[in-house]
């Protein structure tokens, strides 16, 4: 991307988005893990413009702090300016220009905050065309099979751009035109300022339309150019939730395809969803029904899925994660997780470790080679290397007031159904008997067993639950046991 360096970008994000039927501002609705506005600002920041401006209006008090956070993460300044009244896109651009230095004299790119697939390369091509043609304005256009709702591009007989007419103001014949305004422009700032001062609200919406600038500059004898793109999805806008879902699916298709081209096997792209900030290593296999969300990072040669959702999870090389729901966790190299495993935030599983069926973990570190095979809750615990936690074990971490930690050493073997009542420490190499309740520390190498000998209360069910199916079954079994077997020498 090479173009003239004196460039400012103005992103319009002041609209109310009433067709979304939502309390959330339109530009904050998300696709592939980012809000629409975040997609736009990430793309424009890649151009490294001198100035990046966002024009806000509706719900600006909710959007502005998020813009500040994004600016910090991108490591650049993003200026925010307000459009106090919804007077149209022309007025919004005028508000955006007010955030630029008074002596700025370069190119102004105008785009919208609700075109989430627009990329930096497309805008760079627009700027290159604009500079090469020495135009006052260059507009990005595309052709749609159904152009309803878009402004139509009017051209002269020699194919020069003459004007843009909005859907509501177009004549029946103009509405048949399929080349549309993509809502992305490159302007020379002096030409733009001059045309903005002459905009009129004499139209169906009684607003100041930015596209009317094209006709004004044309009448001034200025050069008006267009850059047509075939990939119309890049400039598709979102006005309702149907369009949000459609563009979300298209963006996901592109993300999945990019991973496939980079060496990832995706068995069923139609049921696989990958956020834009997720990363996947080579020769990893993604099974159907998998969602990789947020900043999830998958290593090389992993097996992920089926039916797995990972949000902000790091997975090391050669790991297997099957039918698992995890968030804000780390899975070590060559580890095995699943099926039906729930990793809550703060889980760290070491290299070669195992979390098996119906295991839930939270805020815990499980060491290298340690196995928690099934039916276990591990919360607020630190488990050393090469230990084994028996089936049905529970880390009892909550005393009704505070969460307490348990520390389990390396090479520990806990029997099935062990209860670790935190805070408690179990030393290296210790064992616990099945069903043991660990309330006190266990020294290294010790066997911990709780509870006395088993005591059977005879006939308790018949006495305490008479008439129940259990009591009847017990009565029959007792009767059969009390009947002597027949004498083989004297059959009945």
Swiss-Prot record:
Binding site for acetyl-CoA: 391, 397-398, 434
Cited Pfam families: Hexapep (PF00132), NTP_transf_3 (PF12804)
Cofactor binding note from Swiss-Prot or TrEMBL: Binds 1 Mg(2+) ion per subunit.
Single GO biological process annotation from the record: UDP-N-acetylglucosamine biosynthetic process
Keywords of the record: Acyltransferase, Cell shape, Cell wall biogenesis/degradation, Cytoplasm, Magnesium, Metal-binding, Multifunctional enzyme, Nucleotidyltransferase, Peptidoglycan synthesis, Repeat, Transferase
Compartments in which it is found: Cytoplasm
Annotated UDP-N-acetyl-alpha-D-glucosamine binding sites: 12-15, 26, 83, 88-89, 151, 166, 181, 239, 344, 362, 377, 388
Region of interest: N-acetyltransferase: 263-492
Chain segments carrying region Pyrophosphorylase: 1-241
Region Linker, residue ranges: 242-262
Gene Ontology molecular function: glucosamine-1-phosphate N-acetyltransferase activity; magnesium ion binding; UDP-N-acetylglucosamine diphosphorylase activity
Catalytic activity of the protein: alpha-D-glucosamine 1-phosphate + acetyl-CoA = N-acetyl-alpha-D-glucosamine 1-phosphate + CoA + H(+); N-acetyl-alpha-D-glucosamine 1-phosphate + UTP + H(+) = UDP-N-acetyl-alpha-D-glucosamine + diphosphate
Cofactor(s), names only, from the UniProt record: Mg(2+)
Region span, Disordered: 443-492
Entry keyword annotation includes Repeat: yes
EC number(s) on file: 2.7.7.23, 2.3.1.157
InterPro entries: Bifunctional_GlmU, GlmU-like, GlmU_C_LbH, Hexapep, MobA-like_NTP_Trfase, Nucleotide-diphossugar_trans, Trimer_LpxA-like_sf
Quaternary assembly: Homotrimer.
Family: In the N-terminal section; belongs to the N-acetylglucosamine-1-phosphate uridyltransferase family. In the C-terminal section; belongs to the transferase hexapeptide repeat family.
Name of the protein in its database record: Bifunctional protein GlmU
Originating organism: Mycobacterium ulcerans (strain Agy99)
Gene: glmU
């Amino acid at each position: 991307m090479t173009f003239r360096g004196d460039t400012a970008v103005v992103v319009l994000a002041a609209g109310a988005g009433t067709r979304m039927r939502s309390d959330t501002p339109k530009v904050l609705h998300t696709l592939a893990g980012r809000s629409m506005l975040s997609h736009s600002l990430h793309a424009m920041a890649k151009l490294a413009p001198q100035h990046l401006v966002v024009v806000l209006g509706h719900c600006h008090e909710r959007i502005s702090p998020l813009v500040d956070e994004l600016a910090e993460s991108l490591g650049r300044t993003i200026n925010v300016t307000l459009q106090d009244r919804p007077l149209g896109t022309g007025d919004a651009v005028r508000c955006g220009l007010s955030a630029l230095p008074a002596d700025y004299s370069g190119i102004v790119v105008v785009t919208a905050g609700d075109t989430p697939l627009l990329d930096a390369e497309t805008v760079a091509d627009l700027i290159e065309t604009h500079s090469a043609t020495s135009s006052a304005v260059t507009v990005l256009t595309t052709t749609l099979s159904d152009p309803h709702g878009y402004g139509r591009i009017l051209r002269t007989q020699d194919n020069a751009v003459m004007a843009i007419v909005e859907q509501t103001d177009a004549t029946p014949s103009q509405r048949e035109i399929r080349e549309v305004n993509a809502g992305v422009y490159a302007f020379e700032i002096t030409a733009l300022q001059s045309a903005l001062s002459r905009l009129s609200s004499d139209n169906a919406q009684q607003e100041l339309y930015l596209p009317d600038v094209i006709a004004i500059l044309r009448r001034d004898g200025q050069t008006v150019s267009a850059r047509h793109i075939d990939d119309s999805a890049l400039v598709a806008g979102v006005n309702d939730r149907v369009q949000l879902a459609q563009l979300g699916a298209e963006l996901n298709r592109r993300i999945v395809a990019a991973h496939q081209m980079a060496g990832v096997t995706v068995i069923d792209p139609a049921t696989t969803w990958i956020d834009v900030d997720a990363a996947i290593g080579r020769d990893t296999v993604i099974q159907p029904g998998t969602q990789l969300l947020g900043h999830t990072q998958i290593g090389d040669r992993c097996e992920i899925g089926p039916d797995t959702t990972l949000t902000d999870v790091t997975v090391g090389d050669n790991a297997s994660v099957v039918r698992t729901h995890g968030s804000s966790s780390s899975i070590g190299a060559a580890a095995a997780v699943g099926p039906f495993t729930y990793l809550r935030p703060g889980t760290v599983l070491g290299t070669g470790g195992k979390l098996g069926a119906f295991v839930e973990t939270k805020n815990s570190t499980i060491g290298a080679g340690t196995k928690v095979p099934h039916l276990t809750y591990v919360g607020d615990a630190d488990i050393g290397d090469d230990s084994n936690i028996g089936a049905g074990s529970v880390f009892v971490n909550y005393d009704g007031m505070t969460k307490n930690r348990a520390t389990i050493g390396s090479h520990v073997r806990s029997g099935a159904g062990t209860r670790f009542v935190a805070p408690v420490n179990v030393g290296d190499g210790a064992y616990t008997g099945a069903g043991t309740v660990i309330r006190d520390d266990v020294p290294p190498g010790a066997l911990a067993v709780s509870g006395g000998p088993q005591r059977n209360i005879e006939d308790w069910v018949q006495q305490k639950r008479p008439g129940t199916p259990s009591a009847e079954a017990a009565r029959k079994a007792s009767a059969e046991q009390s009947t002597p077997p027949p004498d083989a020498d004297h059959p009945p």
